[in-house]
């Protein structure tokens, strides 16, 4: 298989720290989110970015990847072999084991006992809207074929139609029994594990079972109260902004969060007061009238007090 340049995909350098890589991931995930991107290959680019993040965000996997990338042009690194726990070892590691195996050639020539096939793990990107209901998904992956020494000889493309249940969460694992690699000598097949990755949303942040959305309001809407249209995962609603609202105030919308078998979360609208552009002469006069009318108000009266 082709070894992808995950750093190039993320637009970062191999020396960058995790914080820099995470920032790049969030930016690209939002850029290529199919709900907002107009690019024809947005979904493919989004999945590629998610794949790169899955490796570079894990310290051990990133170190293994860096080593493989460093030696990618070495013919000895054209193959890998795997243990059942999912670990991968390069050809140099294999040399020691290879000599050990041939030292026991007589025993290897006997009939080996039945052995269970290897499990396979793949990441599935799910959009927030898709978590509300059960939906079908076509999954494509490569089924490795191992030789007697645990080394991959070839990979066979495989496609499955699967159901992703409603209420799946980030990191949740879904088991598809028997869809891993075939067993040896009559042993059972391994399993396929789907690891759910909830894609970042351009509007909503996940907080447990709840969702948060930042709602921009004008100063007069915050002061006088208003009704504003706010999106949810299903449809738009009319949110009441109470008079005297403050920046950062959280307004709860019950039952509009994430759905699971046990509970349904809420949506929290976090108010953000947005000032109008630089005022003209008439607008400045109105602001001055307001300032004169509220001259006794000191917003910093309790500032810094415990």
From Swiss-Prot:
Matching SUPFAM superfamilies: Chaperone J-domain (SSF46565), HSP40/DnaJ peptide-binding domain (SSF49493)
InterPro entries assigned: DNA-bd_curved-DNA, DnaJ_C, DnaJ_domain, DnaJ_domain_CS, HSP40/DnaJ_pept-bd, J_dom_sf
Domain of life (superkingdom): Bacteria
Keyword DNA-binding: yes
Domain J: 5-69
Keyword annotations: Chaperone, Cytoplasm, DNA-binding
Recorded GO CC terms: cytoplasm; nucleoid
Record-linked PROSITE patterns: DNAJ_1, DNAJ_2
Matching CDD domains: DnaJ, DnaJ_C
An example Gene Ontology biological process: protein refolding
One Pfam family here: DnaJ
GO molecular function, one term: unfolded protein binding
Compartments (UniProt record): Cytoplasm, Nucleoid
Chief location of this protein within or outside the cell: cytoplasm
HAMAP family noted in UniProt: CbpA
General function of this protein: DNA-binding protein that preferentially recognizes a curved DNA sequence. It is probably a functional analog of DnaJ; displays overlapping activities with DnaJ, but functions under different conditions, probably acting as a molecular chaperone in an adaptive response to environmental stresses other than heat shock. Lacks autonomous chaperone activity; binds native substrates and targets them for recognition by DnaK. Its activity is inhibited by the binding of CbpM.
Descriptive protein name: Curved DNA-binding protein
Protein source organism: Shigella sonnei (strain Ss046)
